[in-house]
């Protein structure tokens, strides 16, 4: 099982990796190995237009994640419509509610949108962040108690 630190690092890395995914072509490029390419609704183009990034794993080659709300969907079938599936499972996604192209937003509009994306990240990963902080605090407390115990040649009960 991953430690909270590993999950935290992975979550922050995903937030960083996805910051450039406002660009349709960047999202589309992630679908190079997408299993559905023609004669279906969930082509790479339609997936990228709906805000998805292809995030395959060894066991799940069709995992797609919205770069904005971080909703992961898998088990795609040829007749699945990316916009419909996305809105069914993440109706409050800020990307879905855009009324114009990201490139047409004002600086204020873009900053508001990016703020919403970061809020989505914290909503999804807040427990991971808190668990990581708690583990770090516990480890720091233990190190300090051990240090002072060694400095003053006394024993300190770490359980109380």
Curated annotation (Swiss-Prot):
The keyword Cell division applies. It comes from the Eukaryota. It is found in: Cytoplasm; Nucleus; Chromosome; Chromosome, Centromere. GO terms for biological process: chromosome segregation; mitotic cytokinesis; mitotic spindle organization; negative regulation of apoptotic process; negative regulation of DNA-templated transcription; spindle assembly. Ubiquitination is required for centrosome-targeting. GO terms for cellular component: chromosome; chromosome passenger complex; cytoplasm; kinetochore; midbody; nucleus; protein-containing complex; spindle midzone. Pfam families: BIR (PF00653). The modification Phosphothreonine is found at residue 43. Coiled coil: none annotated. Keywords: Cell cycle, Cell division, Centromere, Chromosome, Chromosome partition, Cytoplasm, Cytoskeleton, Metal-binding, Mitosis, Nucleus, Phosphoprotein, Ubl conjugation, Zinc. One of its GO terms (molecular function) is metal ion binding. BIR repeats lie at residues 27-97. Induction: By progesterone. The keyword Metal-binding applies. Belongs to the IAP family. PANTHER family: BACULOVIRAL IAP REPEAT-CONTAINING PROTEIN 5.1, DETERIN. Component of the chromosomal passenger complex (CPC), a complex that acts as a key regulator of mitosis. The CPC complex has essential functions at the centromere in ensuring correct chromosome alignment and segregation and is required for chromatin-induced microtubule stabilization and spindle assembly. Stimulates the mitotic kinase activity of aurkb/aurora-B in the CPC. Does not appear to exhibit anti-apoptotic activity. Component of the CPC at least composed of survivin/birc5, incenp, cdca8/borealin and/or cdca9/dasra-A, and aurkb/aurora-B. Interacts directly with incenp (via N-terminus), and may weakly interact with aurkb (via N-terminus) to stabilize the complex. Interacts with GTP-bound ran in both the S and M phases of the cell cycle. Also found in a complex with ubiquitin-mediated signaling proteins including at least usp9x/xFAM, nploc4/npl4 and ufd1. This is Baculoviral IAP repeat-containing protein 5.1-A. The lineage of its organism: Eukaryota, Metazoa, Chordata, Craniata, Vertebrata.
């Amino acid at each position: 099982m991953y430690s909270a630190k590993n999950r935290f690092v992975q979550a922050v890395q995903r937030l960083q990796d996805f910051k450039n995914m406002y660009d349709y072509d960047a999202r589309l490029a992630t679908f190079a190995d997408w299993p559905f390419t023609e004669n279906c609704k969930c082509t790479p183009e339609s997936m990228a237009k709906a805000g998805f990034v292809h995030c395959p794993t060894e066991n799940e080659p069709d995992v797609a994640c919205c770069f904005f709300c971080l909703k992961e969907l898998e088990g795609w079938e040829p007749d699945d419509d990316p916009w419909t599936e996305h809105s069914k499972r993440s109706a409050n996604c800020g990307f879905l509610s855009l009324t114009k192209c990201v490139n047409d937003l004002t600086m204020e509009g873009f900053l508001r949108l990016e703020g919403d994306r970061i809020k989505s990240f914290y909503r999804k990963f807040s427990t991971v962040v808190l668990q990581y902080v708690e583990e770090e605090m516990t480890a720091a407390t233990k190190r300090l108690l051990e240090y002072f115990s060694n400095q003053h040649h006394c024993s300190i009960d770490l359980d109380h």
